[in-house]
Amino acid sequence: MMKNELGKPPEKSGNGDGARGRSVTRRGFVLRAVLVAALAALTAFGVGFAWFTVRVLSERPPSIYETDAIVVLTGGARRIDEALLLLAEGAGERLLISGVNPSTTPESIRKTTGGDSQLFECCVDFGYEALDTYGNAVETRKWIEEHGYRRVLVVTSAYHLPRGLFELRHIDPETVFVGYPVPLGEGAGPWYDNLRYVKVLGSEYLKFLGAHVRAVTGLRVLRPAKQET
């Protein structure tokens, strides 16, 4: 009679260890893939932001306007003042101030800017419908169609100009839009030393990307509850 070997542990199959090893390998592969994708996205975002910043900082007013009219997109300091100076200099025959707050009257704008009353009466139009840059583009297109303009000078802050021109050209590809950047006026120091300017550029870059997404998808997920700045 064979002796039963008590106390000897049964031999384990290698199948369980192999399955666990393959599971760990798959998790490691997925984790590496996620990290690589995140790093690639972060790099692309950084490169895009650098390109956007260089574009904003290198924007200069055109040497020759050759434009029929002027539109100023409200929301930043000095935009309307610059547009009125350009109108007085003959850069266009009319000026549209797009995105005016409904509670603001033409006379209050004239007094604030110190504009000439005759110039306001003859040659300045006010748009009250736009709440954001997309709305500016829609409002401007209607105004252009009413007057039959072909070349329009667009006045807005330098950081806002890329998005403003993109929205206008997307909404109205038949019109030639010429950008006129208004400096932010933050002083002589480097832009990266000014935290407020860095935040403005970062926020505007995200909006710039959002405008491209909306143009491609045709979706407008969010509409602002108040006027954009």
What role is predicted for each listed range?
Residues 10, 43, 105-106:
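Generic low-complexity, intrinsically disordered sequence content enriched
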Residues 20-60:
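N-terminal type II signal-anchor transmembrane helix
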Residues 23-28, 189-190, 196, 200, ...:
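Coil-to-alpha-helix initiation sites in intrinsically disordered, low-complexity, charged segments
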Residues 228-229:
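Short, solvent-exposed mixed-charge patches
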